[in-house]
Amino acid sequence: MQSQSKKFCAYALAGTAFAVMLGLSAPSLNAQSAPFAALAGSWSGAGRIDLQDGTSERIKCRASYSVGDGGLSFKQQLRCASDSYKFDVNSNIQSNGGSLSGTWSEATRNLTGKVSGNASASRIQARVDGGAFSAGLNVYTNGNQQGITIVPQGTEVKGVTVTMVKGQG
């Protein structure tokens, strides 16, 4: 049972990291004065979760964004499902002079954490922390598509890759 709980936490952290990264990719979509303005609306996509034992699972995700503070903050709701897990993540992200910070929660398992990072024109590098779990994150944005890579540390999850498209779903 402990292994199953640890595996769920790894998936939940990966999902949370993914949720945060969807939000953090906004600076490449819009000017620095309103980095999250282009996020408003719905996004959807699919990808893969790779496990340390060499197996993998497909994952599908849908996200919705409510942007505020003139494009400097947003609230996000993300729902993802693979063959083994479903999770529902909420995040609140702010931008302050190019530095990104925020919080996330996964309601079904009462998990919470923080995010921090930096952005350039088309690439985001960030870190998500939640208790005993952490993950490194990279996002590349091109138009209305986002490519996301997540590498959790200390879990059964080796990595997560997802492509999202705005306005579908």
Positions of PLM-derived features:
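N-terminal secretory signal peptides that target proteins for export/translocation
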Residues: 1-9
